[in-house]
Amino acid sequence: VTQDKTWVAEMYPKLVAYHDWWLRNRDHNGNGVPEYGATRDKAHNTESGEMLFTVKKSDKEETQSGLNNYARVVEKGQYDSLEIPAQVAASWESGRDDAAVFGFIDKEQLDKYVANGGKRSDWTVKFAENRSQDGTLLGYSLLQESVDQASYMYSDNHYLAEMATILGKPEEAKRYRQLAQQLADYINTCMFDPTTQFYYDVRIEDKPLANGCAGKPIVERGKGPEGWSPLFNGAATQANADAVVKVMLDPKEFNTFVPLGTAALTNPAFGADIYWRGRVWVDQFWFGLKGMERYGYRDDALKLADTFFRHAKGLTADGPIQENYNPLTGAQQGAPNFSWS
């Protein structure tokens, strides 16, 4: 290590700008906890800035625009499905395309969920416009605060504090440490569900709850790898981490033939061959192992790693490493020679 501050000095303002972009463009309620969303784009909105969506019923479909129209359509419920480019963009922005937490579920799964007493509205996403001070549309936020995004923002603040300290900016370092602590407190107070013992995204309500949370955890959409992001980033309390690891090691949840898939077996949207709703992605698997190790579960993490290498088809042979793997059979899925993996 050269201890050369030049590179740190060059990168620091760029990383500060990136940090601030999220708070300016994806923090609709201004509480410091960003959401995922969509930029202003012809694929997402009309020229006048109204969000696009397509209503599908039977063999008919109609493209409409505007958040007010969207709210009316959702309230009436007279549709088979909705196609919303901004919803897709938000999931892509997270890196977890079509994940259950963003409201994605197959029709047959949703029908079963409703038949078992659930509500279709549990899987309906809502949006808000984000605008600059002069009223210019910047883009859209899902009206839910994502626990993985909050956890990464926690890490961002820690790293910025370290860089500010190196560069002799003590006040800025202090500010970023405070922001990190505020995020950790929020994650553990608002995003952990004591009943199911797991972390979830939070649905943003019209008014904050009495405890300062924007809303309640979205437990209905099931458990996913976002739930161990507070462990990977070090934002979790030890007690909450203990509970999450117990879920991760449960054969009825994530501890499958190939463990730590992108949806728990109990998730209503789970499918062993569904993109980001069951398949095992190596990056999310690794995040889980590192989070376990960080909170004192190294031996358990090593056992899961051993299971992965033994059961993921072709992984220890001469073939290419796959994009993802079937959690129940270990079958190769997705693209070969995938860079993340």
Predicted features by range, described:
Residues 33-145, 185-280, 313-341:
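Extended glycan-interaction surfaces of carbohydrate-active proteins
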Residues 19-22, 164, 184-187:
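A structural signal for well-ordered alpha-helices, especially hydrophobic packing surfaces
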